[in-house]
């Protein structure tokens, strides 16, 4: 049975049984381009809050499923408040033999507020998420390339959130600590270590760590290609 054709118009949106058209986009988009800021810039806090609010405002458009929206919310919080992306990137691009103990210690001990603010990458990431929330029908007649690009963004974000949810499940139910996966990135270290150097507990984690390691490695390379910070 077809849904009744009802259209609701408000000051902010036009709503049909299938789609919602947002009239004003200003609170989801950046007001202007920002230059890369250093850790001592007095504007740093303002810019971080500006990006954070816009990512969070997109939460209702991520999915109709509460679990997915909650995972998105938790992931955004983690990215802004806890993730040491420079350490994660270093572990991906530097195999065991090329890793410097000094560099690892410096990156591991760098506080979030002391890191360079990657404004350009954050802006491109916001554009990526905006595309994943936007819908255009894929037809050859009208904007097929734009519609397909939005679909790719939506599928990538869906896979990312699915994997992040699996990490949360592993932390809750599989005896893997939060620090191992999201702070120390042990899964990017253990899988490349010789088995003789691992204890029994670490060996049990290898299959799951391999899955997370492959995904995060691919994600880092994707970010390098797109100039994003997914």
From Swiss-Prot:
Supply the alphabetized keyword list.
Answer: Sporulation
* UniProt-listed InterPro entries: Irc19
List the induction conditions: During sporulation.
Superkingdom as given in the UniProt entry: Eukaryota
Q: Name one GO biological process term.
A: ascospore formation
Free-text disruption phenotype from the record:
Displays increased levels of spontaneous RAD52 foci in proliferating diploid cells.
Function, as annotated:
Involved in sporulation and maintenance of the mitochondrial DNA. Is probably involved in a pathway contributing to genomic integrity.
State the similarity comment: Belongs to the IRC19 family.
Name the chain's protein: Increased recombination centers protein 19
The species this protein was found in: Saccharomyces cerevisiae (strain ATCC 204508 / S288c)
Classification of source organism: Eukaryota, Fungi, Dikarya, Ascomycota, Saccharomycotina
